[in-house]
């Protein structure tokens, strides 16, 4: 049994690619938790997609035993957290389970937008933050400049920042000593009623749902009857233990410790992340603070390219939902694309990852419709409904006004690219809140409509700043806006999958963009095809695909002109009839390209 004073719970916060998972690997190696032959890169990133993209999606935990220079053995619980904004709720929960953080900053790149967001999360959670400068072995490293930047931008004292290179292993011992000496030990009472914070949960085919917890008070034992305070569901603990990263079973988890338990729980949806686990017979009076259900921010339609894959898609979504409770879906039908699902995500990266996992792990070929955000529609009869799908928008005559979500975005950019970045934000209806400088980098804070960001804001930002700008956002509030639904008509038939909601000022340009793209992609027919963008009954943009023409007069040599005229008139009649009854088949490739985001 480890004394409370010998336990340290910490997480590592960093921007993507600043070396967080590599540092975790080195700490695991230095404490001898894994033999050298079993070591692999990004030890804690369990999904292939996490390893390939170099990002952490699910929070993971590992217990390390470290013999410090003072001769005592300390139990270090490392919580590896996601760094990306879409998983900000996972970050805030992981931080609530710890008392301190290592702030990892790349010594060549300096402070980035997500570094800021995550550090503020850590400071809000009351953490002791230890700055760590990584990649000091790089020729481009400028540790002194970056130290100054951390002091200017974040306000942390960097006089005793730890200098390391996680890749080569320089300074790892200093990090371990800093953890022991500078971070506070956890507090807790083993005799109080059980209070454990549910940090994460995932589905294991053999054990059912594995639940990751941090014990605040009381003791969690094998065979104990427990209750979830948010859902009021009761279970019996089958097994409990911890990860080193290998799974090790024990009989109990005590205050200050992090570990897991299993309890014959069938679905991850039954375990709400951030919930409090307590004893069924002797429950705690109050749950631990900070629980909030996660709400999808971005919605889009997923349709199988081959209609026969519909059942497989449904089963695959159900399996993914077992592991990711923040992801939601409901069945949807589209006249153009057939049967599919309307899915809700935490953000664009979350959407990409789910789509990639469906294609990779379940071998599905999918079409994704353009992502849309959740609008609030206030009707004239006083009702308010949330709109996930542009096709479901009520008749404009019944709408009083609409509201759209706005975000607070933080953009870090080298000052030579600041002009184009500010122009981009203004084009996207942004309102500047703040602009500050730290050395040669500027930090701009803007309020932006989320609708303008989901299309291609991130790609545009990266291209105008040559990849140097970093971007982070949080959903701020809803505000009233002049929004309209743009329908795309092909040969006077509306194509539901291509309709979208947009601000009135941008409706024409966005509609024209899609019409132009479809004109290039739909094959020519024997009759003229009109592609139109309409707001209600008013056409705002139109492109025409001219008809293929067969030369019907080719067989006439000389002779009377009336013969030719008769043939041409006959052809004209036929074309007219075709235009009336002809159906235009839009090929899949045209759909995919038209749905590719962007205003081009």
Swiss-Prot record:
Keywords tagged on the record: Cell inner membrane, Cell membrane, GTP-binding, Hydrolase, Membrane, Nucleotide-binding, Protein biosynthesis
EC number: 3.6.5.n1
List of residues binding GTP: 17-22, 134-137
The keyword Protein biosynthesis is annotated on this UniProt entry: yes
Pfam families reported in the protein's UniProt record: EFG_C, GTP_EFTU, GTP_EFTU_D2, LepA_C
Main EC class the enzyme belongs to: hydrolase
InterPro entries to which the protein is assigned, alphabetical: EF-4, EFG_III/V, EFG_V-like, EFTu-like_2, G_TR_CS, LepA_C_sf, LepA_CTD, LepA_IV
Cellular compartment(s): Cell inner membrane
Annotated Gene Ontology cellular component terms: plasma membrane
Reactions performed catalytically: GTP + H2O = GDP + phosphate + H(+)
Gene Ontology MF term list: GTP binding; GTPase activity; guanosine tetraphosphate binding; ribosome binding; translation elongation factor activity
Primary location recorded for the protein, binned into one broad class: membrane
CDD domains reported in the protein's UniProt record: EF4_II, EF4_III, LepA, lepA_C
Known role: Required for accurate and efficient protein synthesis under certain stress conditions. May act as a fidelity factor of the translation reaction, by catalyzing a one-codon backward translocation of tRNAs on improperly translocated ribosomes. Back-translocation proceeds from a post-translocation (POST) complex to a pre-translocation (PRE) complex, thus giving elongation factor G a second chance to translocate the tRNAs correctly. Binds to ribosomes in a GTP-dependent manner.
The family this protein is said to belong to: Belongs to the TRAFAC class translation factor GTPase superfamily. Classic translation factor GTPase family. LepA subfamily.
Database matches in NCBIfam families: lepA, small_GTP
Name under which the protein is recorded: Elongation factor 4
Lineage: Bacteria, Pseudomonadati, Pseudomonadota, Alphaproteobacteria, Rhodospirillales
